[in-house]
Amino acid sequence: LLDIETGTQEVVGDFPGMTFAPRFSPDGKKIIMSFAKDGKSDIYTMDLENRIVERITNHPSIDTSPSYSPNGKFIAFNSDRSGYQQIYIMKSDGTNVKRISFGNGIYGTPVWSPRGDLIAFTKLHKGNFYIGVMRTDGSGERLLTENYYQEAPSWSPNGRVLIFYRETKTNAKGEGFSAKLWSIDLTGYNERLVETQTDASDPSWSSLLST
């Protein structure tokens, strides 16, 4: 954990493997994360007050990128339990797991919208990456933007804009790459470069800022 006011850092948990893709629960009392060990990955939560860790999924597959619904009752995540990465939702206790993505391609990085009615995602199809949205039952899939490589969408607090990062080739020979932040309206219009002093990736929108 990093205190953005003081700069103080704290290591929480001592896992005998690799933890990644952490997110806070809506009430800020828990962290949800992926924990990888022995070639598989499952989803865990940690209570920030008592440091109790709870295993949410236990499946011989790779379960990653968990994201809470705004009310904290559901979790979206991606898993290769169907053979390749797709998006699933489940109750916050790990029960009632349902696959919701059925389009062509590989899906990842699902993120619940602030209103709880949509899930943003990354999709890889025919060599290109897309940022898209779908309803929480998997219907109404819309692809908003396409590029050589882009992922990690994050919602604006008002639910109208997505920010993500995109890698582009720095020369015609493809010998170098540059990672920058971009935003796009939920309509699929107004795609904009977000200026940063250096390369940037994996954005997360502050709940204190809106557009």
Where are these regions (language model features)?
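Sequence signature of WD/YWTD-type beta-propeller architectures
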Residues: L1-T211
